């Protein structure tokens, strides 16, 4: 992040507030574009697409929780479907699997109280806008308070390799 020219903060509800706090705590002083995540399937907002397409190094802080149904004391109580759902999100975040993140089951995500259900598809579209290769790393995953939290780092690693004859 420190080598980035500008920052896009993407979230919904409390995610934006938490993102601001994280940026202040880490002394971010560069340009900041904030975007409250629109509903799944909406196009990438023009100002985000322009920022990603620019020559600047842009960092994206995408804030969104997984399911809130991981334990009996969770906000949504225990729902066994949350295990497979959150595992698939963790795998997609690790693999920078844009297709999986853009095609989340929105009905199930709503039932599982997934705050990231609108955020992750937009982050995935950002990756798809870039022609480079991406590397993912899941740095944190836990379920405190029955809510699934992920911290993943996606890094652009340059132009795509070409294969073929």
Q: What spans do the regions from the language model cover?
A:
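Flexible, D/E/H-enriched segments
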Residues: 1-44, 75-165
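A general structural motif
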Residues: 4, 55-57
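Hydrophobic helix-cap positions at the C-terminus of alpha-helices
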Residues: 51-54, 126
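Beta-strand elements within well-structured catalytic alpha/beta cores of enzymes
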Residues: 57-65
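Extended accessory regions or peripheral subdomains of proteins
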Residues: 67-76
């Amino acid at each position: 992040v420190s080598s980035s020219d500008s920052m896009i903060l993407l979230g919904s509800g409390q995610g934006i507030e938490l993102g601001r706090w994280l940026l202040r705590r880490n002394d971010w002083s560069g340009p900041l574009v904030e975007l409250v995540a629109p509903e799944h399937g909406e196009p990438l907002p023009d100002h985000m697409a322009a920022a990603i397409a620019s020559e600047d190094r842009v960092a994206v802080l995408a804030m969104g929780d997984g399911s809130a149904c991981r334990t009996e004391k969770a906000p949504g109580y225990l729902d066994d479907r949350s295990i497979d759902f959150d595992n698939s999100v963790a795998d997609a975040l690790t693999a920078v699997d844009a297709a999986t993140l853009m095609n989340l089951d929105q009905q199930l995500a709503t039932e599982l109280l997934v705050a990231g259900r609108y955020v992750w598809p937009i982050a995935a579209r950002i990756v798809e806008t870039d022609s480079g290769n991406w590397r993912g790393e899941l740095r944190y995953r836990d379920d405190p308070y029955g809510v699934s939290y992920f911290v993943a780092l996606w890094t652009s690693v340059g132009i795509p390799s070409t294969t073929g004859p």
